[in-house]
Every structure is written in C-alpha cells, then in structure tokens.
C-alpha cells in the first residue's frame, strides 16, 4: 500500500518529474494512471506517481512522505484539500496532523516553505530517534 498515489486533477508526468527533481536518496518516482475501486476517487481516472524504493539503506521515508504531500499540495492548487472530517474518532484535529503527530508539517506546506525547511524543523527530534529505531528495522 501507499506505493501509488494520485488524483483526478494531477498530471502524472509532472508529479513524477517534480518529485525526482528533489534527488531524494534511495527512491525514484514513475508517472502512472489508475482508476481507484474504493475510497475518495472511486471510479475516477487518476494520474499520479508510483514510488519505487531503489536502495532501502538510503531511503528516508520521513522526507519522502513530506515531499509527496508537498508536491500534491503545490501542484494541485485549489483542487488540493486536506481531509476535513473526523478521523479515528478525533474531530478537533485535521487527519493529516493526527497522522503526523503535529500540525507543523501541514503548516509548513501551507506556508510555502521549502522541503528542506520543513524537514530541517524536525532535525533536533530526528537525530536521537534514528539510532533508537535502528534495531527495529527489518531491512
């Protein structure tokens, strides 16, 4: 799951080129087209990108995830919208903030910050976390 993403209003080649332009380590993006069979865009033709991990040792899912949402936001213009209804029985927080554990990622994206600035805002928290997670990695 979550290897392929898109929306009816995105252009797959543009999205893939934009994401590949970041030069993110251990990942490449390929344009794709699909028609979801469930959920938000069920039955609608969508374009997007397929995320292909090329080197699991250098791949950074945290940075990649932020890059994906920032690209969809930036390229989607007025068509892009964060989920506004209740999620996991929580009504007072946007779903994206709940999943991220903070509103800082969304706020940075909305403010037009660069990917580097958004990610850099978490460096002090990430640095001690990375060694702790190492023993739990499967690959």
Model regions: which residues?
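Charged phosphate-binding loop/patch that engages nucleotide di/tri-phosphates or the phosphate backbone
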Residues: 135-139
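Conserved functional hotspot residues or short segments at active or partner-binding sites
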Residues: 2, 6-121
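Short amphipathic alpha-helical coiled-coil/interface segments
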Residues: 122-126, 130-133
């Amino acid at each position: 799951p979550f290897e392929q993403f898109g929306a009816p209003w995105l252009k797959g080649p543009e999205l893939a080129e934009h994401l590949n332009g970041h030069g993110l380590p251990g990942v490449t993006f390929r344009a794709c087209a699909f028609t979801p069979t469930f959920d938000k865009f069920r039955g609608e033709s969508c374009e997007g990108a397929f995320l292909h991990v090329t080197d699991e040792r250098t791949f950074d899912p945290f940075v990649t995830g932020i890059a994906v949402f920032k690209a969809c936001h930036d390229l989607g213009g007025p068509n892009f919208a964060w989920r506004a209804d209740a999620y996991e029985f929580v009504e007072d927080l946007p779903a994206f903030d709940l999943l991220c554990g903070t509103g800082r990622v969304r706020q940075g994206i909305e403010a037009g910050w660069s990917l580097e600035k958004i990610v850099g805002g978490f460096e002090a928290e990430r640095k001690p976390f990375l060694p702790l997670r190492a023993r739990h990695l499967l690959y």
